Amino acid sequence: ECYAGQRVAINLSNIKKKEIKRGCVLAPVNSMKNTDLLDVKLNVLDSSLRVLTNHSRLHFFTGTSEVLCRAVLLDKEEIGPGESGYVQLRLEEEIAVRRGDKFVVRFYSPMETIGGGVILEPNPKIKRRFQDDVIEELERKESGSSADVIALHAKAHGDTLISCAELAKLTALSPEEVAEDVKELEEEGTIY
């Protein structure tokens, strides 16, 4: 067992060095879904000398990954020093992340750290700016439990059936967490 901040080594048999790169995530098969869109809560540093504007190009860092992205501000025109906001990051490459993962963003040029935050939704749909329902959904995802997130995903699928395995992949939760939350939601009558 290892913890954040520790260095570890893993022996991966039958894997060639060119098949993996810095930032790859080691996870059980079909437990995560690669994404190039992220819904996040972004906090700009008090010490930042710059203001984040819509469609700013940024360097995104999480774990050992570094990816270029565009920041679409969902609830504000700009985010200044010491402020925070809901942002959809549109990545230039796909990565695998989980809800709750922390990240850091830096300006594209000059490469100065602007802030960081937490991933609220690892597999969102493209969102439009200044939509009340979008902001409400992100507020629920920020303050809610994993059961709330599952309920939102089930609602988004409407009349179609979605399996627990697919919910686990979409939410990047473990199958056990999903099964427990689905049982709780069924008992409440939230989902059927």
Residue ranges and their predicted role:
Residues 2, 14-192:
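C-terminal effector modules of nucleic-acid-centric enzymes and ribosome-associated factors
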Residues 4-8:
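Membrane-interface junctions of multi-pass transporters
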Residues 11:
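NTP-handling and nucleic-acid-processing catalytic cores
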